[in-house]
Amino acid sequence: MNLNFMPLLHAYNHASIDFHFNSSARDFCVHEVPLYEFSNKGEHAIIQVRKSGLSTLEMLQIFSQILGVKIAELGYAGLKDKNALTTQFVSLPKKYAPLLEKNTSNFQERNLKILSLNYHHNKIKLGHLKGNRFFMRFKKMTPLNAHKTKQVLEQIVQFGMPNYFGSQRFGKFNDNHKEGLKILQNEAKFKNQKLNAFLISSYQSYLFNSLLSKRLEISKIISDFSLKEGLEFFKQKNLNIHSNALKALKNQDHPFKILEGDVMCHYPYGKFFDALELEKESERFLKKEAVPMGLLDGKKALYAKNLSLEIEKEFQNHILSDHAKTLGSRRFFWVFVENLTSKYIKEKVQFELEFYLPKGSYASALLKEIKHQKGENNDEF
């Protein structure tokens, strides 16, 4: 497979919308929503931290330097954008809690502020979050483009959006996925095992994004082309589909089509199951009750079946399934934006947007879908 970045397809068909977005503490805010309530009892102090101009790992290093706590003793649920104003929860052994208030000024000098202190019986681990609330401010937006943006947001609220991995996965030079493949091929290796694992996951992310874009292409052809043209497309791709099956796919109301053999999952979390009754599963998808899952290839990955598998095969790589430490999984192809509110400030030609996304989903994917500029696999705006 060609590892150069290719343009990723959008879900909706509007023309590009021109505006300026700056990923800065003033115009981009991220607030972590924890997975569970903290009990206020236990051996782990839980602090809510606000930071700006710092990555999560840089923040942890500051805590280690100021408090004397080992980085391995600190717990966090996920990485937050360095340029944004972000809040997230960090756990540390209870014995360090008295030092927090004493070092308030030291934290503030490093662009950190402790917002709250709680306690819990376990350390926060990666993935221990429900999702994130976001605020974004778009600048230099004309009234016409504000109107177009609101129309796009109505579609996104109704149907959801592609769950692309964001640019953070691919690095400043767009080559993390290439380094990950080199590690899998034993052509490169770093002493830091976490870095090796991250780079391999970047390669998985690249394959996932590419598969999702291919599925969007197929969905658009099913929706927009005649039955005859659709059958010809599938024939050219060596994909077998009966005319009656294609008719049924065209009748699905959702823009992203559920295919025979898709792996589905109850939304926003639940068990995996196979898409057998496509009409039924498409209706559940419309109701936001279940979502098709894309492949993150690996040793224990669950593969699709039938037509879905035939499409998926192009984005599988045995080197991932043979790698002992790369277990693999499935990831939502599609996510739903919740609690979305927007406001256009005509005097400032600015558009403000607030919304919630489940964990693992990127605000940059929503930005990509709104802006609709031709970009690459790891679009930057």
UniProtKB/Swiss-Prot annotation:
Which keywords does this Swiss-Prot/TrEMBL entry list? Isomerase, tRNA processing
Molecular function (GO) terms for this protein are: RNA binding; tRNA pseudouridine(13) synthase activity
What does it catalyze? uridine(13) in tRNA = pseudouridine(13) in tRNA
**One of the Pfam families matching this protein, by short name:** TruD
**Boundaries of each TRUD domain copy?**
160-335
Q: Tell me if Electron transport is a UniProt keyword of this record.
A: no
Q: What residues make up the catalytic site?
A: 81 (nucleophile)
The EC number(s) attached to this protein equal: 5.4.99.27
The entry's family comment says: Belongs to the pseudouridine synthase TruD family.
Q: What is this protein called?
A: tRNA pseudouridine synthase D
Organism annotation: Helicobacter acinonychis (strain Sheeba)
The gene for this chain is: truD
